């Protein structure tokens, strides 16, 4: 019997080269790029009240349904510490009513006509 020709080996080689071209290998995956983080604009809030802002505080803030230092700071463009002190002043004059005080967060609401000023 003559030796058989190795038909399997010759058939395998072309397939290997084709597989490399198709799948481009299962080695390293493409490296993920770092995303550019979101950039916030710097807040330039007032440190002291000027006349128009102070009048706005007395006119508009007592009409808000939910009053917190953060809300006042954002709407009137004043610092948080200034907003805190302003709300204490409004509460003492009876224009707003304190609802909750928990650690650093204080929540006020508008004073209704039937309420007595809270001391």
From Swiss-Prot:
One of its GO terms (cellular component) is ribonucleoprotein complex. Keywords: Ribonucleoprotein, Ribosomal protein. Residues 28-37 have a biased composition (Basic residues). It holds the Pfam family Ribosomal_S25. Residues 1-42 are annotated as: Disordered. Belongs to the eukaryotic ribosomal protein eS25 family. This is Small ribosomal subunit protein eS25. It comes from Spodoptera frugiperda (Fall armyworm). The gene is RpS25.
């Amino acid at each position: 019997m003559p030796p058989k020709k190795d038909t399997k080996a010759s058939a395998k080689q072309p397939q290997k080269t084709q597989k490399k071209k198709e799948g481009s290998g299962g080695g390293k995956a493409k490296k993920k790029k770092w995303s550019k983080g979101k950039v916030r604009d710097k807040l330039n809030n007032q440190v002291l009240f000027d006349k128009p802002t102070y009048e706005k505080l007395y006119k508009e803030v007592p009409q808000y349904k939910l009053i917190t230092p953060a809300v006042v700071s954002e709407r009137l463009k004043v610092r948080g510490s200034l907003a805190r002190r302003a709300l204490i002043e409004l509460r003492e004059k009876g224009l707003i009513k304190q609802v909750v005080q928990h650690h650093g967060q204080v929540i006020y609401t508008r004073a209704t006509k039937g309420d007595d000023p809270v001391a």
